[in-house]
Amino acid sequence: MFDAIIVGGGPVGQFLALAAARAGRHILLLEAKPAGAGFNDDRTLALSWGSWLMLQRVGVTEQLEPAATPILRIHVSQRGGFGRSELTANDGGVSALGYVIGYGDVQRALAQRVTASDVRYHTSVDGIDQVDDGVVVHAAGENIAARCAIVAEGGGPLVATLGFSQREKDYGVHALVARVRTDRSHDGVAYERFAAVGPLALLPRSDSFALVWTLAPDDAQAVLGLDDQAFLERLQRAFGWRAGRFIAVAERGAFPLVLRQSEPRVRDRIALVGNAAQTLHPVAGQGLNLGLRDAWLAAAHLPKLDELDRARRLDRAATVHFTDALAGIFANDWPGLSWARGLGLAALDLLPAARRTFARTLTLGRL
């Protein structure tokens, strides 16, 4: 009998499989898509320093390094108000605040480490039944027994089918994503600029930036429809000139922003991790990193899922609150709040202890 069956072969599911195998667990990973399906996915991921260390422990960072761009400094500011702050790798006591990389690069590196006997592709899970000594997973016409099941697949109906409820908060805005280039080197600097509707982030990736731009839904669609020159001019007005002049744009898209949380995270012998457990606002880039921490602790506690729930509760709650509060504080025009935000950013820049605490939150995911 397997110690655990992992449902979902994205980055969190594959990382969990590797971490569990490293801990001596007998696991099976089930993935609905064919092998290699995500290798050409060029979406941008931001890995914290803490996530990088976990990936190092399962032996994939050597493969990731050629495609990863280190974040050496983060510049935080607000549009139309005073106050700014800069966080450096030195503030966090690390060699990099994080790394920016493509989804496909992470997926490929993890897949190359997962043992072929531990994974089945093209295998959809229809349901999971709990029995006296574990679970029975119904997949592709087969009934597979295990001591527990971990669901890391967040995009399909399985979570609801299993009886988990979901609470959703619609932020009422869209994230416009793209790759943009400027007329000068990024030097490993990431930018987070807050405006009334939400943040505009530039993440250094290779020789360009990954853009995440929060806009009202109608504005997002209008900006998507602009030609390249008009798009770059609109972006320049919104962001300013700190990163240089924007000269090229590619790979545009947009999607609505929501906070989605599944309840409970653990039900007897079934647990949810990653996007199956929660989907966060992208501010501060904490979603994937929280999912990897879920997976790391899950591997350590298998198959005792009640212990996993207790071990993860504080970090999950703190990270969800941190990202939700950060999005809310900066995404409105309440009278006087701009001054309060400015004072907060100025204090962060002037007080080394506060700056180090914030840097540790971003790099290690702990408040």
Outline where the language-model segments fall.
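Conserved N-terminal helical subregion
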Residues: L64-L162, E168-A175, D228
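Conserved Rossmann-like nucleotide-cofactor binding loop
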Residues: V12, A35, G156
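Glycine-rich FAD pyrophosphate-binding loop
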Residues: A21-R43
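N-terminal Rossmann-like FAD-binding beta1-loop-alpha1 element of flavoenzymes
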Residues: F2-L29
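N-terminal FAD cofactor-binding segment of flavoenzymes
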Residues: D41-R79
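FAD/FMN-dependent oxidoreductases across multiple families
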Residues: A222-L290, D294-P303
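C-terminal helical "tail/cap" subdomain of flavin- and related membrane-associated enzymes
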Residues: A300-L367
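Conserved FAD-binding catalytic core of PHBH/FMO-like flavoproteins
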Residues: L55, G141-N143, A149-R245, V249-R252
